[in-house]
A protein has these predicted regions:
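A structural motif corresponding to the C-terminal end of an alpha-helix
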Residues: 163-168
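Hydrophobic alpha-helical packing residues
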Residues: 16, 20-21
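Hydrophobic positions on the alpha1 helix immediately C-terminal to the Walker A/P-loop
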Residues: 12
Length: 168
């Protein structure tokens, strides 16, 4: 599932998992950034808790590479083992999110290049909602704001998702 912050991907992923379970189909929801060591590091970078030595935020290319590294580790440590056991995997965000989010800063070509080796999903669902609705949902959550969760980026982000899906 792909979509901007506040689009409802997490809610939809759980609804899909529940529906599959009701039909006797084994499925697990997972998310990116992952809860693994690289994903944890990445969340600290996105929240501004880890910065460059001079206090400035980590650059866009490094962030894109961290997302790709987290995704690669997530595939190897969790997604592939689940799939080999016959479990359906519902991923709350995958590489199209990098095309949209990191593509805004470093360009779609770079974001696509660092994600080129990733396993291709069988199905991609894009949850597209109005920017104001997404902002309202996001603002109602009691979570720390991350780098890409600023209002000025949200309409550009929605268009970036649309562009990523047209081109890929």
């Amino acid at each position: 599932l792909e979509g901007a912050d506040g689009a409802g991907t997490t809610t939809q992923a759980e609804l899909i998992r529940s529906s599959l379970a009701a039909g006797g189909i084994d499925a697990q929801v997972t998310a990116q950034p992952s809860k693994g060591p690289i994903g944890t590091l990445l969340r600290s970078v996105l929240r501004g808790k880890i910065t460059r030595d001079d206090g400035r935020r980590i650059g866009g290319r490094a962030i894109a590479a961290l997302f790709a590294a987290d995704r690669s580790e997530h595939i190897e440590s969790l997604i592939e083992p689940l799939l080999s056991e016959g479990v359906h995997v519902i991923c709350d965000r995958y590489y199209h999110s990098s095309f949209a989010y990191q593509g805004l800063e470093v360009g779609l070509d770079y974001a696509a290049a660092v994600n080129a080796p990733m396993k291709t999903p069988d199905l991609i669902l894009f949850v597209d909602v109005d920017v104001d609705v997404a902002l309202q949902r996001r603002d109602s959550r009691a979570t720390e704001q991350e780098l890409y969760e600023v209002e000025a980026i949200q309409s550009r982000l929605r268009e970036a998702y649309h562009t990523a899906f047209r081109l890929r």
